[in-house]
Swiss-Prot record:
<dbReference type="InterPro" id="IPR005794">
    <property type="entry name" value="Fmt"/>
</dbReference>
<protein>
    <recommendedName>
        <fullName>Methionyl-tRNA formyltransferase</fullName>
        <ecNumber>2.1.2.9</ecNumber>
    </recommendedName>
</protein>
<comment type="function">
    <text>Attaches a formyl group to the free amino group of methionyl-tRNA(fMet). The formyl group appears to play a dual role in the initiator identity of N-formylmethionyl-tRNA by promoting its recognition by IF2 and preventing the misappropriation of this tRNA by the elongation apparatus.</text>
</comment>
<keyword id="KW-0808">Transferase</keyword>
<dbReference type="InterPro" id="IPR011034">
    <property type="entry name" value="Formyl_transferase-like_C_sf"/>
</dbReference>
<dbReference type="InterPro" id="IPR044135">
    <property type="entry name" value="Met-tRNA-FMT_C"/>
</dbReference>
<dbReference type="InterPro" id="IPR002376">
    <property type="entry name" value="Formyl_transf_N"/>
</dbReference>
<dbReference type="GO" id="GO:0004479">
    <property type="term" value="F:methionyl-tRNA formyltransferase activity"/>
</dbReference>
<feature type="binding site">
    <location>
        <begin position="110"/>
        <end position="113"/>
    </location>
    <ligand>
        <name>(6S)-5,6,7,8-tetrahydrofolate</name>
    </ligand>
</feature>
<dbReference type="InterPro" id="IPR036477">
    <property type="entry name" value="Formyl_transf_N_sf"/>
</dbReference>
<dbReference type="InterPro" id="IPR041711">
    <property type="entry name" value="Met-tRNA-FMT_N"/>
</dbReference>
<comment type="similarity">
    <text>Belongs to the Fmt family.</text>
</comment>
<dbReference type="GO" id="GO:0005829">
    <property type="term" value="C:cytosol"/>
</dbReference>
<dbReference type="InterPro" id="IPR005793">
    <property type="entry name" value="Formyl_trans_C"/>
</dbReference>
<keyword id="KW-0648">Protein biosynthesis</keyword>
<dbReference type="Pfam" id="PF02911">
    <property type="entry name" value="Formyl_trans_C"/>
</dbReference>
<dbReference type="Pfam" id="PF00551">
    <property type="entry name" value="Formyl_trans_N"/>
</dbReference>
């Protein structure tokens, strides 16, 4: 099939490469978000998907208003049979959705109807789900509600960050998307409506929402930190210093101190503990402002934290 591929971040690259290399499909163009400021100088840089497409001599479409009449006409002139979407990053209007005769097929990183929205992987980890997956479905105007073509499942490991899990889903999801498009091209695949029950939402997580709330139970905090790693990144105030947090540990490998009030900090020779709404959590790595991630105990000793300083 003649395909237009819509995607923006690195997460979309496995699917893009799979479709470019497929002998059954022809990626005639890539649709991605406009170049965005990057680095300290704020120089506009193309998205990972744009860079990958340009390296393969595939035309790149970067409309600032993808639902404008002008862009709908531009896409229509390309005459795609189907459009494949992986993390494009913009809502698609009715006119745009009506361009390809086989519609728009989205790869979403959850087992729909669970975790509709921008942050499904983060939501699954934070909720303590044991299993998640990826779903291909026909895009409709309403959010992630279209009929489903196929799914693939993935176990959530106890130490998975959102980055870890998304990396695996991007690869398995690429296979699923390719198989889905093969089935559509053959006329052998029919989408089925999503169940009405089991709908949950996963809106984008803000930087403020990634701030650790130490009054919560330790297991919830541990999951939430993994859920926002690497982006937007967990953080806390230690005194008046804003510190990013790497992994935290709730295990039997190291004996924790006695009970600590939420936010209270205890430092020994090898470890840093912070009190929660239940048992203390052990910090693995921290990133003070302007520095790289470092061992939490090394940082705490060097910073000579006052015993009265708390995390908040």
């Amino acid at each position: 099939m003649r395909l237009v591929f819509a995607g923006t971040p690195e997460t979309a690259l496995p699917a893009l490469h799979q479709l470019i290399d497929s002998p059954r499909h022809d990626v005639i163009a890539v649709l991605t978000r406009p170049d965005a400021a990057s680095g300290r100088r704020g120089k506009p840089e193309p998205s990972p998907v744009a860079r990958a497409a340009l390296e393969r001599d595939i035309p790149v479409l970067r409309p600032s208003r993808p639902n404008s009449a002008e862009f709908v006409a531009e896409l229509s002139e390309l005459a795609p049979q189907c459009c494949a979407v992986v993390a494009y990053g913009a809502l698609l209007g009715d006119a745009l959705l009506g361009v390809p005769p086989q519609g728009w097929v989205n790869l979403h990183f959850s087992l729909l109807p669970a975790w509709r929205g921008a942050a499904p992987v983060q939501a699954a980890i934070a909720a303590g789900d044991a299993v998640t997956g990826a779903t291909t479905f026909q895009i409709e105007p309403s959010l992630d509600s279209g009929p489903v073509y196929g799914v693939v499942t993935e176990t959530i490991r106890p130490t998975d960050t959102a980055g870890d899990l998304l990396g695996r889903l991007a690869v398995s999801g690429a296979e699923l998307l390719s198989a889905t498009l093969d089935g559509i091209a053959e006329g052998a695949l029919t989408a089925r409506p999503q169940p009405a029950d089991g709908v949950t939402l996963a809106p984008k997580i803000s930087v403020e929402q990634a701030r650790v709330r130490w009054e919560l139970p330790a297991p919830i905090i541990e999951r939430r930190i993994r859920a926002v790693t690497p982006n937007p990144g967990a953080w806390t105030l230690i005194g008046d210093l804003r510190v990013k947090l790497g992994p935290v540990y709730l295990d039997a490998a190291v004996k924790p101190p006695g009970p600590l009030p939420p936010g209270a900090i205890q430092v020994d020779r090898k470890h840093v503990w912070v009190g929660t709404g239940s048992e203390p959590l052990r910090l693995g790595q921290v990133q003070p402002p302007g520095k790289k991630l470092m061992n939490a105990a090394d940082w705490a000793r060097g910073a000579r934290l006052d015993p009265s300083v708390r995390a908040s």
